[in-house]
Amino acid sequence: VFILIGKLKYKFIVTCFAMGMLLISYTRVSAEETKEDKKPVDIEADSMDYDNFLDKYHAQGKVVIHYSGGVLNADDVELDNKNNIATARGNVLLKMGEDTLQGDKIVFNIENKTGVAYKGRAFYSRNHFYIKGDKIEKTGEQTYFIQQPRATTCDGDYPDWEIAGSEMDVTIEGYGLMKNARLVTEGLPV
């Protein structure tokens, strides 16, 4: 009887060990598949550091980040690879196709393509439309919210006319809603 119980214990331990190894290998394969599902991000810079524990890159000097759907240029970028958040400062330019977003600082999710530009300037090529604002928030694939907006279709730093307001919701299709709107020409409200 004791020999039979000893053999059953041994079989139970071996079975538990085998099941544990299967679970561990399945978890490892699942994690690798998840990593491979992530779209690649290519980072170029004069200097770069990587924190393995936090999974963050810090790139400085002529930083160029290529990601699915665009390119981010800046003097200094911290990329939180785990959360797909890039925080860029200094000469920041984000290109998404023919559209551009510039700012003193841009915090951008490279996976869902949303983010915020501070002291921002945006250009939408489809409608040849420029917007400046204290804060330009890309809320979706085709939608924006702007604080203290100034919008125009005129080229150059000093447009002949622009519409200014306190806040604005806009879509790439060219529709927008501005609060406290006023027409400004040659820098003066009309």
Give short role names for the model-derived ranges.
Residues 31-190:
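Structural signature for solvent-exposed beta-strand/loop edge elements and short helix-capping sites
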Residues 2-16:
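Bacterial N-terminal signal peptides that target proteins for export
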Residues 14-25:
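Bacterial N-terminal signal peptides
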Residues 1-2, 25:
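Disordered, low-complexity tails and leader-like regions
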